[in-house]
Amino acid sequence: MDGVVIKNTGSQYLVRCTDGTELYCMAKGNLRLKGIRSTNPVTVGDRVEIVPASQDGQPAYIKRIHPRRNYIIRRASNLSKESHILGANLDAAVLVCTINDPVTTTVFIDRFLATAEAYRVPVILVFNKIDCYTQEDRLQLDRLSAVYTAIGYPCCHVSAITGEGLPDLKSLLDGKLTLLAGHSGVGKSSLINALIPHADLRTGAISQAHHTGMHTTTFSQMIDFPDLSPGSALIDTPGIKGFGTLEMGEYEVSHYFPEIFAASKGCRFGNCTHTHEPGCAVLEALRRGEIAESRYISYLSILEDENAERYRPEY
């Protein structure tokens, strides 16, 4: 029997079967996809083959994961070689950002975008809490949005409290399975409650000591839109503190920054790292202001990760 994983509680997975029934299943201990060392071998959005519970008391279990069309993955922790898969078989991903309380840095945004580029997942940047922004915050919002829209990433300015911008965002999600990600405290749960009122997700407050969010979502789950086209759904995920990248070779990183990749076609050397080489078209574009400095800094940060990974000993 086949189905789609719609919830991951850590020990069990809720699977919606092709006949519409929903079953909690265990994952077999040897269930792994080739070439992926993951803390969660099964993720929400996975298409799976399951074996129903038997009459002798054996619980239902996931027998096989069907090949994934794509997925979003991050390093499980800074010192880990294992990964954590946020969601699979996605039509889009929404990264929820805030200018303040908490601050979403451009490095965090760019690491998420680069990973999504690597796995061919289109991203929409959603800047939430615009009802709370000062004039200075709004100027910063406009500057950031200009950088990302110029590259090709749609940017939505919304308020989960007032509803501003939500109709436009909702239209972008119609007919899509969309992953929702971001730091704790950016208002993901409030945003889902505003978009899908029946979701009734718990929301949390901001830690005033650290200006970071406190986790309210503790597991990933798929939530259907009742008023959009069939197949329209969000995958809600727990808040992420950092975004460590994986599986990017030193000479591949630039491929996942569209504007850097476009400029790199003019480089003198095919193995240019765009850091110091003579005849580097990327550095020239950076000097001319055609590549945002913040984006180049993010590129360097991922490049440093990959160089450090090469010299990390096996344990």
Curated annotation (Swiss-Prot):
Chief location: cytoplasm
Alphabetical list of InterPro entries matching this protein: G_CP_dom (IPR030378), NA-bd_OB-fold (IPR012340), P-loop_NTPase (IPR027417), Ribosome_biogen_GTPase_RsgA (IPR004881), RsgA_GTPase_dom (IPR010914), RsgA_N (IPR031944)
Residues holding Zn(2+): 267, 272, 274, 280
EC top class, as a word: hydrolase
Domain of life: Bacteria
Cell location: Cytoplasm
GO MF, one annotated term: rRNA binding
EC number per UniProt: 3.6.1.-
Cofactor note: Binds 1 zinc ion per subunit.
Swiss-Prot/TrEMBL keywords: Cytoplasm, GTP-binding, Hydrolase, Metal-binding, Nucleotide-binding, Ribosome biogenesis, RNA-binding, rRNA-binding, Zinc
Ranges of residues in domain CP-type G: 79-243
Key word RNA-binding present: yes
Cofactors named for this entry: Zn(2+)
Pfam family, one: RsgA_GTPase
GO CC, one annotated term: cytoplasm
Ligand binding (GTP): 128-131, 182-190
Biological process according to GO: ribosomal small subunit biogenesis
Database matches in PANTHER family: SMALL RIBOSOMAL SUBUNIT BIOGENESIS GTPASE RSGA, SMALL RIBOSOMAL SUBUNIT BIOGENESIS GTPASE RSGA 1, MITOCHONDRIAL-RELATED
Quaternary structure (record): Monomer. Associates with 30S ribosomal subunit, binds 16S rRNA.
Family: Belongs to the TRAFAC class YlqF/YawG GTPase family. RsgA subfamily.
Role summary: One of several proteins that assist in the late maturation steps of the functional core of the 30S ribosomal subunit. Helps release RbfA from mature subunits. May play a role in the assembly of ribosomal proteins into the subunit. Circularly permuted GTPase that catalyzes slow GTP hydrolysis, GTPase activity is stimulated by the 30S ribosomal subunit.
Listed HAMAP family: GTPase_RsgA
Official protein name in the record: Small ribosomal subunit biogenesis GTPase RsgA
